[in-house]
């Protein structure tokens, strides 16, 4: 990331009613010219908000506390993701029966990488598949507790596992089905299987809190931060941070020389920085190229992070189709 000073440890949350707002997908009628949009994440970043560039619409939104694990729906893919918007982590345990685990132990803490290249649970089929999972923090900064999980099997139809609150003998068994229309199906340790993510063909950008992990930073080992930013859809979306930040100068000819990437945090968080003077946010020079699920190229630039009342968590951007 370009601006380490932009790292912000954000653990200030508040509760709200469960709010999912699926919006029916409409075949995109591409806008001509520049459009300006503001996304409401809320000042405590309680929401994970899915946005589609072609329609300039929020297609779904849910609270970050609504799920714990995300199970890949890609055919043959065994990946299981943590809910990175809660600073979750795991400890891998080998050689200890599931029923005997009563405390945090094993190799860890392990985290998912924000770029999507590695997940803490990636090797679950190579060992015993037993983990202690730290569920992180809810919207009010309450510790959501810890569970032990045994990931048992995966086939073409889904995943089988069992879990229990750490220290409890009440073991829950669950099957999480694959759904080819989405990237992943979620599981809440409180509410069971959750269908929260919109169809993978319907969105391009996820505005959310997410965990940023460093093996080493400023001489400290294994540093984790919660940051507020934008992640791209791992299904077919590509993007790149541009050297040219004059929005009007970004055209087809310029983008032909840009190499796009599928790293999910390529847009990320560091288009802004926190300023101690006034305790506010400054927008840094930024511009991005984004190729959508449909294969259309857009130029994209953040212009603000505050709402009309000066509250954070309301990223505003301008975007335009480049053709």
Where are these regions (language model features)?
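Sec-dependent signal peptide recognition
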Residues: 1-9
């Amino acid at each position: 990331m370009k601006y380490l000073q932009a790292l912000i440890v954000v653990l200030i949350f508040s509760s709200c009613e469960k709010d999912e707002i699926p919006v029916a997908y409409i075949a995109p009628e591409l806008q001509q010219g520049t459009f300006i949009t503001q996304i409401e994440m809320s000042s405590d970043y309680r929401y994970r908000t899915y946005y589609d560039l072609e329609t300039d619409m929020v297609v779904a939104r849910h609270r970050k506390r609504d799920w714990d694990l995300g199970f890949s729906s890609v055919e043959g893919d065994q990946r299981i993701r943590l809910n990175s918007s809660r600073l979750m982590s795991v400890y891998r345990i080998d050689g200890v029966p599931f029923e005997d685990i009563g405390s945090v132990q094993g190799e860890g803490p392990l985290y998912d990488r924000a770029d999507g290249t590695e997940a803490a649970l990636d090797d679950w089929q190579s060992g015993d598949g037993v983990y202690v999972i730290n569920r992180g923090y809810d919207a009010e900064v309450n510790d959501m507790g810890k569970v032990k999980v045994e990931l048992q099997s995966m086939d073409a139809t889904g995943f089988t596992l069992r879990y229990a609150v750490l220290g409890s003998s009440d073991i829950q068994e669950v099957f999480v089905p694959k759904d080819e229309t989405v990237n992943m199906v979620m599981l809440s340790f409180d509410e069971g299987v959750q269908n929260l993510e919109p169809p993978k063909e319907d969105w391009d950008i996820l505005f959310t809190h997410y965990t940023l992990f460093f093996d080493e930073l400023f001489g400290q080992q294994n540093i984790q931060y919660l940051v507020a930013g934008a992640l791209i859809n791992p299904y077919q979306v590509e993007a790149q941070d541009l050297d040219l930040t004059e929005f009007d100068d970004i055209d087809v000819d310029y983008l032909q020389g840009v190499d796009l990437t599928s790293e999910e945090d390529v847009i990320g968080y560091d288009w802004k920085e926190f300023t101690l003077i006034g305790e506010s946010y400054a927008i840094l020079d930024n511009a991005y190229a984004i190729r959508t699920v449909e294969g259309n190229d857009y130029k994209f630039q953040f212009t603000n992070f505050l709402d009309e009342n000066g509250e954070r968590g309301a990223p505003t951007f301008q975007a335009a189709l480049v053709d």
